């Protein structure tokens, strides 16, 4: 976007020049923010590096959020690693208050997801502690450390994704997932249910990952180091995902590490080609988005794996807790409005999938085998439908759309 200049006479032959943006392109919000660029702004005014063109021109306004009124195809759009990032709709001036309010509420909902997710993990941590103190190490063997490790790697990858997008609330949710899962793995190692060498390696990766993401979020990390970290999690995610999908169907398929090793080779080759300029700009952006998508697909595969287990062993479903599934549905559901509001297709896909198929899907299975009451199932159904309907309606109001389906259209195809 080309800047304009306002010249103010100081008397004599001196003139003070203030650079500014086109008049109709931006409005200043009244709300101050200590991190004014922590969230993606509409129209691509904020790049992934979190630097806004206007704040580079004039430091006087650097503490005020800038929200574009119109969609502008800026240069920062082409630099984004994420499909449809920064492609939000365009709230008119008359709807700007609703836009601000819903922006604030969706951020609070996203941060509130910490509560149900913490309640999901906390009982397991307490139970493991009680068994360890009682010397009942065998009980901890029932907790699958490999599945926990996979979830931890997924949380770590998504933490990097949200840290790059400056989505503070979502990043905190993923950080909580990393820390709580690591505590469980530590307990399993103490009970000798997890090999200590794997735990040491995992601890090193977790420590490095948390430090790198924290430094990057606060602008204290070089681009080269961050890019190296992204390459590592991309290779790790692409290697683990096919192996998990293959292992789900063992013994119907041979037990083999071929899917993981093949994917590892492809991932390394893709990274090398991207960093040596062998890929087009579109290809480089695609490779850059893989870590987030593979992490999302890991979590999306969890309900598939659970449904497959329920199909093979219907009696096992009685071991599921309806409260646990409800908490899972609530945690993922709370992030749906924010993902829709910032037009993040990857985030919305993962959250909606987990809400419908992992949380609500297992509640439905429990109801079908008479493991939960009809009133509980009806309440969960009405609550879910109402919440999704509310998210679509308020998003349409915030952006000044006549139909909530326009929000979904913008999410997939852009404004």
Swiss-Prot record:
GO terms (BP aspect): carbohydrate metabolic process; maltose metabolic process; response to nematode; starch catabolic process
The region called Disordered is annotated at 74-93
The organism's place on the tree of life at top rank: Eukaryota
- Report how it sits in the membrane: Multi-pass membrane protein
GO CC list = chloroplast envelope; chloroplast inner membrane; plastid
Location within or outside the cell: Plastid, Chloroplast inner membrane
Q: Where are the transmembrane segments?
A: 139-159, 176-196, 199-219, 231-251, 252-272, 286-306, 322-342, 345-365, 373-393
Hey, what's the signal peptide range on this chain? none
Functional summary from the UniProt entry: Probable maltose transporter. Essential for the conversion of starch to sucrose in leaves at night, probably via the export of maltose from the chloroplast. Required for root cap cells formation.
Q: What's the protein called, per UniProt?
A: Maltose excess protein 1, chloroplastic
This chain's source organism reads Arabidopsis thaliana
Question: What is the organism lineage in this UniProt record?
Answer: Eukaryota, Viridiplantae, Streptophyta, Embryophyta, Tracheophyta
């Amino acid at each position: 976007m080309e800047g304009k200049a306002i010249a103010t006479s100081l008397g004599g032959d001196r003139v003070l020049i203030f650079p500014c943006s086109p008049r109709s392109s931006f409005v200043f919000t009244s709300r101050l923010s200590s991190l004014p660029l922590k969230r993606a702004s509409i129209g691509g005014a904020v790049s992934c590096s979190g630097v806004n063109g206007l704040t580079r021109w004039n430091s006087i306004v650097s503490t005020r959020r800038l929200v574009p009124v119109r969609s502008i195809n800026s240069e920062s759009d082409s630099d984004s690693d994420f499909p449809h990032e920064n492609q939000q709709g365009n709230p008119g001036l008359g709807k700007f208050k609703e836009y601000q309010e819903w922006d604030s509420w969706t951020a609070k909902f996203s941060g509130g997801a910490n509560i149900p997710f913490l309640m999901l993990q906390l009982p397991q941590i307490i139970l493991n502690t009680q068994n360890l103190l009682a010397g009942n190490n065998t009980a901890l063997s029932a907790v699958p450390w490999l599945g926990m490790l996979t979830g931890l790697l997924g949380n770590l990858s998504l933490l990097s994704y949200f840290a790059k997008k400056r989505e503070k609330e979502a990043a905190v949710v993923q950080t909580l997932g990393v820390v709580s899962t690591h505590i469980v793995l530590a307990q399993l190692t103490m009970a000798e249910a997890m090999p200590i060498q794997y735990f040491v390696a995992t601890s090193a990766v977790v420590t490095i990952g948390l430090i790198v993401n924290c430094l990057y979020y606060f602008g204290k990390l070089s681009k080269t180091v961050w890019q190296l970290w992204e390459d590592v999690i991309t290779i790790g995610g692409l290697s683990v995902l096919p192996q998990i999908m293959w292992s789900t169907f063992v013994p119907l398929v041979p037990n083999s590490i071929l899917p993981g090793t093949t994917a590892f080779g492809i991932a390394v080759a893709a990274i090398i080609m991207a960093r040596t300029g062998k890929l087009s700009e579109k290809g480089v952006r695609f490779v850059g988005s893989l870590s987030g998508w593979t992490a999302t697909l890991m979590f999306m595969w969890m309900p598939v794996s659970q449904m497959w287990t329920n199909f093979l062993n219907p009696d096992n479903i009685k071991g599921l807790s309806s409260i646990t599934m409800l908490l899972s549905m609530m945690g993922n559901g709370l992030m749906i409005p924010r993902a829709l509001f910032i037009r993040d297709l990857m985030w919305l896909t993962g959250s909606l999938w987990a809400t419908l198929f992992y949380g609500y899907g297992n509640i439905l299975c429990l109801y079908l085998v008479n493991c939960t009451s009809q009133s509980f199932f009806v309440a969960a159904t009405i609550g879910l439908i109402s919440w999704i309907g509310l998210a679509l309606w308020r998003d349409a109001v915030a952006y000044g759309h006549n139909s909530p389906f326009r929000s979904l259209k913008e999410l997939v195809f852009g404004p």
